[in-house]
């Protein structure tokens, strides 16, 4: 399989911001192009999802999770405890006061650690606290150029001022390296999984 992505102004801006405007090239399918098939996805119709333990395919839309959090957590806990003999996962206790409570968050990797994504997180956290003592947030930019730009535009400062830990660019959080949650903690991560 391969995919074809049409470059646009956002792509051009990315190269310009990263000091490589000459690297931008307009790309689109040729007028005379033959393909075995087409899978067209209107990304504006795709709902945000979350992958829950114990497998990346165990996904729910954010709306489903918000509406049925306690039931979903019971199902995950029961399935995990059957799957891992002798283990007693307790994820249901993370649901109280009508919400899921987490102790750790991570924004990292090629999917989560993008410049735009980290800027959005910084904008949300600006002037706020991410919950020092109750919640730990680590942010791993996906590249050194992204980190440098976050420092230049002030977003790195906003994250640090909110109590987030700004980490080095590092390929590892996606597979669990770094920021291992403490026993019994619930960690939520925006990474490639």
Question: Model regions: which residues?
Answer:
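Fe-S-dependent hydro-lyases/dehydratases of central metabolism
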Residues: 1-193
């Amino acid at each position: 399989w391969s995919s074809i992505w049409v470059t646009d102004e956002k792509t051009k801006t990315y190269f310009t911001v990263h000091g490589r405007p000459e690297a931008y090239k307009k790309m689109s399918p040729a007028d005379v192009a033959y393909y075995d098939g087409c899978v067209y996805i209107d990304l504006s119709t795709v709902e945000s999802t979350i992958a829950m333990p114990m497998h990346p395919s165990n996904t729910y839309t954010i709306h489903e999770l918000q509406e049925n959090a306690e039931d979903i957590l019971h199902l995950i806990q029961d399935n995990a405890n059957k799957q891992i003999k002798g283990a007693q996962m307790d994820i249901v206790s993370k649901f109280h006061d009508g919400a899921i409570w987490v102790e750790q968050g991570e924004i990292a990797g090629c999917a989560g650690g993008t410049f735009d994504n980290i800027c959005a997180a910084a904008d949300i956290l600006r002037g706020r606290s991410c919950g020092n003592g109750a919640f730990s947030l680590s942010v791993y930019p996906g590249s050194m150029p992204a980190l440098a730009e976050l420092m230049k535009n002030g977003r790195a400062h906003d994250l640090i001022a909110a109590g987030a830990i700004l980490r080095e660019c590092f390929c590892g959080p996606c597979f669990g390296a770094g920021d291992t949650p403490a026993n019994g903690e619930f960690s939520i991560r925006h990474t490639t999984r």
